[in-house]
């Protein structure tokens, strides 16, 4: 499981960098876990160079028996009875006249719980699009009502592969609504906007990375299996959002080092965190292309013969939409598709005032998997 968590987290950071390059000062929010799961299903049906590129981009090449690892991980992450709601759902929508290989369909069902729903892309692509959107809307409690925009599928579409993830968690320590006030949020050195700033003082895991002048705060959700971890620079020191230095330095080893419990102290923290709601939509072809995944999107080069026995399939688009809302009660999120840090002595009480841009992720603690990763530049 650890190999797969590392592979997924490494991919998460690499994709974060490409999204940040495309939008240097914008909000970012996505589910690397959802994207990796969806492309692992594609990986089942790829061969040759296409398979090699996919394996390298997602670091599946460092994981033994990747599909059964995903099977265990998906089961572990979406265990029933937890005090949060975390739902994963996969489904394949295939052109009903097209012959997919039975062994491909058996494997996606067994490893990813993904059934094939036959639809009529050829003669009724708009109906098929609506059906897919309706399913995703149901899986994400209405938070992602339209995954596929008009025109994304057409009469030539053979396969749409959908992964949806939905999360709703209550803070272990809730903020009191009466403590929320209007406060300025600094977007950069010059501009501010007014936000609803929540406040509480409780014991939290807190750390400080001195070479980056950055605070680390872990806020657990009820049940303790999931946490939101926030990286907040002490101040805005660059001409942009103030996150440049962290973004340039962040690696998987460092992120683990900075955010693991042993390196944090459980102390009283005055937490000020804005309420925020982010909805992002990405077509990931060019971002994944920059990470080395190219043949998959090229009709003359893609080899998905493990799905159909022939070479006539390719993936035209990878669409990912994600939604997160953070308030006094907790968080609702959905998505469809090592230098050792030196920690310094902390005071008995610390201030954590998120009144300027920060990076955050939602982690499944038992498996150390990053389920969602984001950056708040303008709440």
Curated annotation (Swiss-Prot):
Its main location: secreted. One of its GO terms (biological process) is type B pancreatic cell proliferation. Keywords: Cytoplasm, Endosome, Lysosome, Phosphoprotein, Protease inhibitor, Secreted, Serine protease inhibitor. One of its GO terms (molecular function) is peptidase inhibitor activity. The record marks 344-345 as: Reactive bond. The modification Phosphoserine is found at residue 300. It comes from the Eukaryota. One of its GO terms (cellular component) is extracellular region. It is found in: Secreted; Cytoplasm; Cytolytic granule; Early endosome. SUPFAM superfamilies: Serpins (SSF56574). The keyword Metal-binding does not apply. Pfam families: Serpin (PF00079). Monomer. Belongs to the serpin family. Ov-serpin subfamily. Regulates the activity of the neutrophil proteases. This is Leukocyte elastase inhibitor A. It comes from Rattus norvegicus (Rat).
